[in-house]
Curated annotation (Swiss-Prot):
The chain crosses the membrane at residues 23-43. It comes from Tetradesmus obliquus (Green alga). F-type ATPases have 2 components, F(1) - the catalytic core - and F(0) - the membrane proton channel. F(1) has five subunits: alpha(3), beta(3), gamma(1), delta(1), epsilon(1). F(0) has four main subunits: a(1), b(1), b'(1) and c(10-14). The alpha and beta chains form an alternating ring which encloses part of the gamma chain. F(1) is attached to F(0) by a central stalk formed by the gamma and epsilon chains, while a peripheral stalk is formed by the delta, b and b' chains. Keywords: ATP synthesis, CF(0), Chloroplast, Hydrogen ion transport, Ion transport, Membrane, Plastid, Thylakoid, Transmembrane, Transmembrane helix, Transport. This is ATP synthase subunit b, chloroplastic. Pfam families: ATP-synt_B.
Length: 178
């Protein structure tokens, strides 16, 4: 304060409040006045603005943390769903392999059954044609025998054949037991 009195004491009385030509002193005084005004008026507003900004940043961080926690929870749910889907896919694949194996076994069994029926049918067919061939051979042989017998009967029996026929009937009668 003593400085201000000295400063006022050095001023001539006649000069008053005129234009100060010392720019350096004027600028320092003006700067000090502006800084004092800014600090007194703007300081409270600036601290309020900074406090609001701090609260906004804290709220944003809390919201970001909450969203990160929600995202982590959704990620965990998605991972669980993926594991469930993988297990389900494995079960479906195993069931598919089981059913395919079962179907292959069924097809093989049906094929073997058809082959056995075909083999049985083949054997029956071969047996049928063998019997047919034997029957035809029997019919042919019997017809040939009958035709030769007819020829003999038509020609007549000579003494040797007459004796053979009589011996045949005699042997039949002796075998007969009433």
């Amino acid at each position: 304060m003593s400085f201000s009195f000295l400063f006022l004491g050095n001023l001539p009385l006649a000069e008053g409040f005129g234009i100060n030509t010392n720019i350096f002193e004027t600028n320092i005084i003006n700067l000090a006045a502006v800084v004092a005004i800014v600090i007194s008026f703007v300081g409270k507003n600036l601290s309020a603005l900074l406090e609001d900004r701090r609260k906004t940043i804290v709220n944003n961080l809390q919201e970001a943390s909450q969203r990160a926690a929600e995202a982590q929870e959704r990620l965990n749910i998605a991972k669980n769903q993926l594991e469930v889907a993988k297990k389900k896919a494995t079960e479906i694949r195993e069931e598919g392999v089981f059913r395919a194996t079962q179907e292959i076994n069924n097809c093989v069994a049906q094929h073997e059954e058809r082959l056995s029926k075909l083999e049985e049918f083949k054997q029956e067919t071969v047996q049928f044609y063998q019997q047919k061939a034997f029957k035809q051979a029997y019919v042919y042989i019997i017809s040939r025998i009958m035709s030769r017998v007819k020829e003999r009967l038509n020609k007549g029996l000579d003494a040797t054949y007459h004796v053979v026929v009589n011996n045949f009937y005699v042997s039949r009668f002796t075998e007969y037991n009433p």
